[in-house]
Design a protein with these regions (language model features):
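Non-catalytic effector/regulatory segments
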Residues: 9-10, 38
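A short, compositionally biased N-terminal segment around positions ~18-40 that is enriched
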Residues: 18-38
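Generic recognition of short, well-ordered alpha-helical interface segments
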Residues: 4, 8, 22-29, 43
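A short, surface-exposed loop/turn module that caps and links secondary-structure elements
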Residues: 32-57
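Enriched for short, Lys/Arg-rich terminal
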Residues: 2, 11, 15-24, 58-88
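Residues that form or immediately flank small-molecule/cofactor binding pockets and catalytic motifs
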Residues: 8, 53, 86
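Short hydrophobic/aromatic-rich motifs at helix boundaries and adjacent loops
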Residues: 1-4, 16-17, 36-40
């Protein structure tokens, strides 16, 4: 599975690289887990509703969430990250 970041999500990721190594480590662990099994595991994965239907959320910290969706099939799947800072 490939991973792609929206530009704002990439900015969020760079923020964690510069500001908080512990949160960055947690985020990296969640991203790896999402690539293995996007809909189960740590971070309390939950499907989002409303205008975010089709997207999933996992807790990074009490305040921050990872928002993502999976597109494609088989080896062509992509984990698309929309946000990894703040709450949706």
């Amino acid at each position: 599975m490939k991973i792609s970041f929206w530009p704002t999500a990439w900015d969020d990721y760079l923020y964690w690289q510069a500001e908080d190594e512990k949160t960055l480590a947690r985020l990296n662990a969640l991203l790896k887990e999402c690539m293995r099994d996007p809909f189960r595991g740590t971070g309390k994965p939950e499907p989002l509703g409303g205008n975010l239907a089709g997207w999933w959320s996992r807790r990074i910290t009490r305040e921050h969430r990872l928002v993502y969706r999976v597109g494609g099939k088989g080896d062509g799947q992509t984990l698309e990250v929309a946000q990894c800072r703040y709450h949706y």
